[in-house]
Structures are given as C-alpha cells and as structure tokens.
Amino acid sequence: MQGLAQTTMAVVPGGAPPSENSVIKSQMWNKNKEKFLKGEPKVLGAIQVMIAFINFSLGIIIILNRVSERFMSVLLLAPFWGSIMFIFSGSLSIAAGVKPTKAMIISSLSVNTISSVLAVAASIIGVISVISGVFRQFRSQPAIASLDVLMTILNMLEFCIAVSVSAFGCKASCCNSSEVLVVLPSNSAVTVTAPPMILQPLPPSECQGKNVPENLYRNQPGEIV
C-alpha cells in the first residue's frame, strides 16, 4: 500500500505465563488500532453517509423533473444503488472508529472495498452520461444537467474516501507480516568446562626423520619411560 511497513519486534521469555503473552499481543493490537484510527474513520464515514444522502436526493430531483430518460446515470439507477452502498460503508466506518475491534475493522475494510468498486462504476456511468448529454441537456435543462455533473463529482469523492478507509483498515488488519515474535528459552544456559588436555609432541615425518640421529628418540640414561 503506502511505503514499507515498519518492523515490530517483541521478545517473550519461553517460560512466561499466558497472561504475559496475552498482554504483549494486546499491546501489538493496540498499535494496529492506532494505525487505523490515524485515518479518521469516523469523519470519513460521516462524509460517506452525507454524500450518499446528497446523491439520493439529486437522483430523486432529476426523476421528478421528468427528464430522467435523458440521463444515463438515472436510467441505470446509479444514484440509488450507489447511495445505499455508501450509507452501509459509511456506517461501518463510523462504528469501527467508535469500537475498533478486529471484526469491525475487517468488516469496514471489506465493505469499503466493495463501495470503492461501485463508486468507480457510478463515476464511469456519470462521465458517460455527462458526455452524451453535453449538447442536449445543457442547452435545454442546464440546471438539471448540472446536477448530473455534481453526482459524478461526488461519486469520485466517494471512491477516494472508500479507498482511504480501506487502506488504513488493511494496514491494521492485514499488513502485519513484518511483526516478529521472538521467544527466548526459559532455562538458563549451562557452561561446561572441559578438563585440560596434555599436548604431546608429534614425531617428525618420514622425510624429516632421515636427517635426525637414530638415538634422538631413544631413552637417555636416567629417563623414565
């Protein structure tokens, strides 16, 4: 996603009780929650819900003016199915920001990913709708045609918000492969001291023995074998 993930290393004694291990895991999860909360999910979720209601209202206004057959976005009901998904994803983003449990963050990540895909589809439909009616609608119904342009812009903004929430949710729940848990053995290391070894001289090699007197390796008088 964004840059390289930072490596987090935790050292756990091998004989540590389960309570200490759970505390360490809890601390690591708290760091992940901080990553998610840095993305301001409550604020972004509120903006998602607001965009959804605006798009829904604009779609109704265009339909009530009886010119909906001229707008491709309204014919395909993009303001309605897109708005429903935006409300759902925005509500989950707010809930995950209030109670950032792992299940809530993963749910927010999944729904915002789907919402971003639908936002792309709605944006493409909106662009085609605006381009196809740039000569007809803007001359006959400039105010209504401007609403279609506004819906397209809001769909693009919704895409950016959904991708942002998904990115921070992924950093908190998925991208944790760089975290390393090091377990140390509980038993202390035992140092064993080996007895000293007596080094004896090596006999000369065969080629060196030719130049050595024969009685060099014989026992001298008074020596003990």
UniProtKB/Swiss-Prot annotation:
Belongs to the MS4A family. PANTHER family: CHANDRA PROTEIN-RELATED, MEMBRANE-SPANNING 4-DOMAINS SUBFAMILY A MS4A -RELATED. It holds the Pfam family CD20. The keyword Membrane applies. May be involved in signal transduction as a component of a multimeric receptor complex. Keywords: Membrane, Receptor, Transmembrane, Transmembrane helix. InterPro entries: CD20-like, MS4A. Its main location: membrane. The lineage of its organism: Eukaryota, Metazoa, Chordata, Craniata, Vertebrata. It is a multi-pass membrane protein. The keyword Transport does not apply. GO terms for cellular component: membrane. Expressed in thymus, spleen, peripheral lymph node, liver, kidney, heart, colon, lung, and testes. Residues 1-42, 95-113, 170-225 are cytoplasmic. The chain crosses the membrane at residues 43-63, 74-94, 114-134, 149-169. This is Membrane-spanning 4-domains subfamily A member 4D. It is found in: Membrane. Residues 64-73, 135-148 are extracellular.
